[in-house]
Amino acid sequence: MTVLRSMKDFSSMNITASILLFVTAIAAAVIANSPAASVYQEFLSHELHFRIGGFNLLSHAGHNLTMIEFINDGLMTIFFLMVGLEIKRELLVGELSSFRKAALPFIAACGGMVVPVVIYSMVCAPGTEGGQGLAIPMATDIAFSLGVLSLLGKRVPLSLKIFLTAFAVVDDIGGILVIAIFYSSHVAYEYLLWAALLYVLLYFIGKKGATNKIFFLVVGVVIWYLFLQSGIHSTISGVILAFVIPAKPQLNVGTYIERIRRIISTFPEMGANNIVLTNQQIAKLKEVESASDRVISPLQSLEDNLHGAVNYLVLPLFAFVNAGVMFSGEGEVIGGVTLAVALGLLAGKFLGIYSFTWLAVKSGLTPMPLGMNWKNISGVALLGGIGFTVSLFIANLSFGSAHPVLLNQAKLGVLSGTVMAGILGYLVLHWVLPQRR
């Protein structure tokens, strides 16, 4: 899951979030193979409910959501909302806002999705039970991969960070489309119709100048419930919600600066012995606060608000309930699915991203970005194999409780492929990037 705001500002957050994800995943694996494994499984299967009168918000198909279902289908909607906000911003003003900017990362991402699927299918043929996991190695974890890249500090050219971020965003778009198209059950269109009407309502309310984020989120919860009942995976509701969040601020920067200057010029001076603000001073400060809120668009404001919750709560919880790989028990721990996923992430991502980038540049379709070369592209192509979050998510959708042995194999493949890709990518970049003077 971050994209271009200021790469330097987010380096520290990416590193911390990546470490937290890694530690949480290790903790889950340790607990799942310890005497506390039964407690861990009970936690995952614990049923939840949120009742308002006779209505239970956390119910689906006649049963309460379990803890793992609530996290995967509920809390992960917040993650996908943030992903949607990032995608929308990149499409409007970022690295996907024009063909010139988007061409190379788009082509690289296509290679990074197609080749892993081909490699997976060579190990687990489509049509078999294992073949259901074809889409697992398609994804790149933005936060995790940028976190590893950030460990190299100022040695990394900004263009390389932009390239990694942009092709990971395109990967996310591909992953979202796969989830929406291939991992939806029987569709109940009446629920989707109500959800569509609410989206249209939010769109026109936003066009009329509404900026209350709480209102959009409350309606978003209603839409999430409708998706949960519809058969379309509920996390998709978060992505679509992002596209009706207003992206235009109420004040432009020029007007904001003029207003702040005027407020400061008329700000009452403090008395020599005063330590408490006067009512007039408080009123002026509230004007500053109001103007500052209006110069930030709801899209950017909500995205900023969600980063902390997603990176330090939602994703660690997701890792904890999904990374509990069993190293013993019924069935093969390491099987064809493990190999297919690990090879897809490690070899497939590298070959796909590197070869498609090479073809795009050598054919003259798009130029090589300033500050990048084939050596550091090879390192970033390896980092593209850090699948983790979305790969684990798709693994659960592919196999779920119906195929616990294959799901366990897929999780082991995701974890091993991610770790190897992260280590190799870091080492390659450490060797090829110029040393700091």
From Swiss-Prot:
An annotated GO cellular component: plasma membrane
Matching NCBIfam families: NhaA
Function, as annotated: Na(+)/H(+) antiporter that extrudes sodium in exchange for external protons.
UniProt keyword NAD present: no
HAMAP family found in the cross-reference section: NhaA (MF_01844)
Coiled coil (residue ranges): none
Catalytic activity entry: Na(+)(in) + 2 H(+)(out) = Na(+)(out) + 2 H(+)(in)
Transmembrane segments: 12-32, 65-85, 103-123, 133-153, 162-182, 186-206, 214-234, 308-328, 333-353, 377-397, 412-432
Record-given protein name: Na(+)/H(+) antiporter NhaA
Keywords assigned: Antiport, Cell inner membrane, Cell membrane, Ion transport, Membrane, Sodium, Sodium transport, Transmembrane, Transmembrane helix, Transport
Designated gene of the protein: nhaA
Protein family membership: Belongs to the NhaA Na(+)/H(+) (TC 2.A.33) antiporter family.
Membrane topology: Multi-pass membrane protein
Any single GO BP term: regulation of pH
A GO molecular-function annotation: sodium:proton antiporter activity
Organism from which the protein derives: Bacteroides fragilis (strain YCH46)
Family matches, as Pfam families: Na_H_antiport_1 (PF06965)
Subcellular location: Cell inner membrane
Domain of life: Bacteria
